[in-house]
Amino acid sequence: MKIANSITELIGNTPLVKLNRLTEGLKAEVAVKLEFFNPGSSVKDRIAEAMIEGAEKAGKINKNTVIVEATSGNTGVGLAMVCAARGYKLAITMPESMSKERKMLLRAFGAELILTPAAEGMAGAIAKAKSLVDAHPDTYFMPRQFDNEANPEVHRKTTAEEIWRDTDGKVDVFVAGVGTGGTITGVGEVLKKYKPEVKVVAVEPEASPVLSGGEKGPHPIQGIGAGFIPTVLNTKIYDSITKVSNEAAFETARAIAEKEGILVGISSGAAVWSALQLAKQPENEGKLIVVLLPSYGERYLSTPLFADLA
């Protein structure tokens, strides 16, 4: 019988789909990896399961442990799903500016939500989570997605291998937004190991260009541009960085839905905008550009991305 023992067994093996109308007249082929096919509707399901599994194997958590994590949303949803399935209590700290849908989803899975000031960004959410662990070290466990090696490792073992397998090794360029840095690190390292000439492109908000050496700043591209260089990010793995404006990210996310029938979030818009610029360049003629799209657009209906549709 083809019956999964748990919802977490359905994480991974997400599909690749070619963009058609958005790439008309461009020199390269662009394929997008749809991470919203994961059961929690985002790429973060992968690291949520990996971090909880790692903590279980290391004996760091038990049924009395309260798992606490700082997250801009999708990691929280992934953790909430995994914790619900495995019977753990979960508390999530997140900036108050995150979308209404994400907050409701977390509560729907039974997670406790602790909101921090928007102006403090992810750094404020992380500080709050750490303060809870420091105050109750025997009760709280923090997976620390920005520092946890299980984050890039699950992308080495799963995401990268899926891309290599599904493109028959023909991938030439990999594009991903950088939040924790786990995806671009894990996927980039493996693809370059298999095919050293693969180019890896990091995407960050123009309004918070920390990877490019600029100043951090507030921006609406949820999930990327944390405002600091995460521990798990291998800053040597990407060949170039694309800075994307808020407007370009929003417009491209809307265009993906309207022209390709693929409903995605804001950071997916940023990543595809970057890929489309690359696809225009003569040196990429005939090449295959793979773009990771982290999450589903329905999670952003209350944000400025789709707010004017109401």
Curated annotation (Swiss-Prot):
It comes from the Bacteria. Keywords: Amino-acid biosynthesis, Cysteine biosynthesis, Pyridoxal phosphate, Transferase. Its cofactor is pyridoxal 5'-phosphate. The keyword Ribonucleoprotein does not apply. Signal peptide: none annotated. One of its GO terms (biological process) is cysteine biosynthetic process from serine. GO terms for molecular function: cysteine synthase activity; L-cysteine desulfhydrase activity. GO terms for cellular component: cytoplasm. The modification N6-(pyridoxal phosphate)lysine is found at residue 44. Pyridoxal 5'-phosphate binds at residues 74, 179-183, 267. Its EC number is 2.5.1.47. InterPro entries: Cys_synth, Cys_Synth/Cystath_Beta-Synth, CysK, P-phosphate_BS, TrpB-like_PALP, TrpB-like_PALP_sf. Gene3D superfamilies: 3.40.50.1100. It catalyses: O-acetyl-L-serine + hydrogen sulfide = L-cysteine + acetate. It is an enzyme of class 2 (transferase). Pathway: Amino-acid biosynthesis; L-cysteine biosynthesis; L-cysteine from L-serine: step 2/2. It holds the Pfam family PALP. Present in outer membrane vesicle formulations which are used as vaccines in human. NCBIfam families: cysK, cysKM. Belongs to the cysteine synthase/cystathionine beta-synthase family. PANTHER family: CYSTATHIONINE BETA-SYNTHASE. This is Cysteine synthase. It comes from Neisseria meningitidis serogroup B (strain ATCC BAA-335 / MC58).
